[in-house]
């Protein structure tokens, strides 16, 4: 069966087998490290047993929101929409917003998009306990911002192509 663009089945969306492969590749107990997602909902990694710094959550400390904002402050500065959304409207959505994606957390492998220049503060991400970035898109300036590409994961039964970056 051919699936429709950006309309994955339940199995394709959560991609359990692929996330098991990622966990095995990392080779540590999932409780011992934290991840963030780009271009895909953090609920996917949470569902698969990963501990995330990003989430869709109703209540969390305002201090945490301010610390998380520092990770992507330069990215928010590129987009008045995202800045306003994160600061004033989308309090429950503690996501890494990327200006190029324009509110799309469904960057399935059908999309042929790359992130040329991500403005991410990896030192702040690391300070918050972030160890890995699960990105649905290639980040071309990854080395410049302190991210090391470890491996690209893709499977026929997954909606995603996941670029696994380590925060260095």
For the regions a protein language model found, what residue spans apply to each?
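Generic preference for hydrophobic/aromatic residues in regular secondary structure cores
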Residues: 35, 93-97, 147-149, 165
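Generic alpha-helical secondary structure signal
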Residues: 16-20, 66, 123
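Short amphipathic alpha-helical surface micro-motifs
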Residues: 16-18, 34-36, 114-117, 144-148
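Generic structural signal for short, flexible, solvent-exposed coil/loop and linker residues
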Residues: 11, 39-41, 114, 122, ...
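A Trp-anchored, charged/polar loop motif used as the substrate-binding/catalytic surface
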Residues: 21-24, 111-123
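Extracytoplasmic/lumenal acceptor-recognition loop(s) of multi-pass membrane glycoenzymes
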Residues: 4, 39-112
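Extracytoplasmic
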Residues: 1-57
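Aromatic/acidic, Gly/Pro-rich catalytic loop(s) in extracytoplasmic/lumenal soluble domains
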Residues: 116-168
